[in-house]
Amino acid sequence: MRLTVLCAVCLLPGSLALPLPQEAGGMSELQWEQAQDYLKRFYLYDSETKNANSLEAKLKEMQKFFGLPITGMLNSRVIEIMQKPRCGVPDVAEYSLFPNSPKWTSKVVTYRIVSYTRDLPHITVDRLVSKALNMWGKEIPLHFRKVVWGTADIMIGFARGAHGDSYPFDGPGNTLAHAFAPGTGLGGDAHFDEDERWTDGSSLGINFLYAATHELGHSLGMGHSSDPNAVMYPTYGNGDPQNFKLSQDDIKGIQKLYGKRSNSRKK
C-alpha cells in the first residue's frame, strides 16, 4: 500500500545552482523545472556532503530514499515518482522524527475541526478524524479530546488556495494536504485541500482516513518513512480500507517519541 498524503512544515528556502545530468533521451523543459522544484522542496541538503547547492547530490538522496539506482541522473522513473501527489515534508530513511523531536508534553491533546469538506457529511469527517487519532493513540500514552470552540492543540480544516499559512494549496492533485509538527501557533495543525475529491473509501477519490492518519502523524511529530508499507510513506495510494493500519515502522517511530501505552499490544 502506497500512501501519498500531503503535508507541510516550515521548509527552509534554498538555492539551486548546478545543472542536473540526464540519461539519453532528454527531458522536456517542464520536466526539468519540475525536477528542480521537487528537489528544492523535499531534499533540503545532502546528509553526507551537506552540499545545499548540488542538485546531483539531492537527486542521489531521492534515489536512495525510493530505492532506485543511485546515479545522480534524471530518467523516466525519477520523473514518474516526482509527478505523483505527495506530502510536503522532506524525506528521510526509515521512520523519522522532525528536527529536535518536537512532541506534545501533555498527556491529553485537544483537537478541533474548524471547517469541513463538502464531499462528506460532518459526522463522517468527525468519525474518521477520531479513528485516525485513535490508531496512533492506542500505541502511545496520549489521549485525544475533541473541543468545539476556542484554540485546540491540533486545529483541523479544509481550505482552497492561499489560506493563511504561507503554504497555498495548488488545486486538484499534487499537494493534497499538509500538517505542522507539535508546537505553538500553527504547530500541530492539519489542513486539507478542498479542491480534492474526499471520500470515506466507498467511492472514487482521496480516502480521507488514509490522508488524516498520515497528516495527524505529522501533527504528533512523525516525519516520513522510506518503508512503502508505512502510513508515513510520502506518496498516496488507495489500499483496502478494511486492512488499513499502522505498520511496525510507524509504531516504532511513534513509540520512540512518546513511549509505549501500558496496554499497547506486545510486538
UniProtKB/Swiss-Prot annotation:
Tell me the protein's name: Matrilysin
Q: Which PANTHER family match?
A: MATRILYSIN (PTHR10201:SF143), MATRIX METALLOPROTEINASE (PTHR10201)
Question: What residue ranges constitute the propeptide?
Answer: 18-94
Q: Which reaction does it catalyse?
A: Cleavage of 14-Ala-|-Leu-15 and 16-Tyr-|-Leu-17 in B chain of insulin. No action on collagen types I, II, IV, V. Cleaves gelatin chain alpha2(I) > alpha1(I)
**UniProt organism field:** Homo sapiens
Q: Which InterPro entries match?
A: M10A_MMP (IPR033739), MetalloPept_cat_dom_sf (IPR024079), Pept_M10_metallopeptidase (IPR001818), Pept_M10A (IPR021190), Pept_M10A_Zn_BS (IPR021158), Peptidase_Metallo (IPR006026), Peptidoglycan-bd-like (IPR002477), PGBD-like_sf (IPR036365)
Xref: PROSITE patterns:
CYSTEINE_SWITCH, ZINC_PROTEASE
Annotated signal sequence range: 1-17
What this protein needs as a cofactor is:
Ca(2+); Zn(2+)
Pinpoint motif Cysteine switch by residue range. Answer: 85-92
Q: Where does Ca(2+) 2 bind?
A: 170-171, 173, 175, 193, 196
So where does Zn(2+) 1 get bound? Answer: 163, 165, 178, 191
Active site, renumbered: 215
Where found in the cell? Secreted, Extracellular space, Extracellular matrix
Q: Which GO terms describe its molecular function?
A: endopeptidase activity; metalloendopeptidase activity; metallopeptidase activity; serine-type endopeptidase activity; zinc ion binding
Tell me the gene name. MMP7
Q: Which GO terms describe its biological process?
A: antibacterial peptide biosynthetic process; antibacterial peptide secretion; collagen catabolic process; defense response to Gram-negative bacterium; defense response to Gram-positive bacterium; extracellular matrix disassembly; extracellular matrix organization; membrane protein ectodomain proteolysis
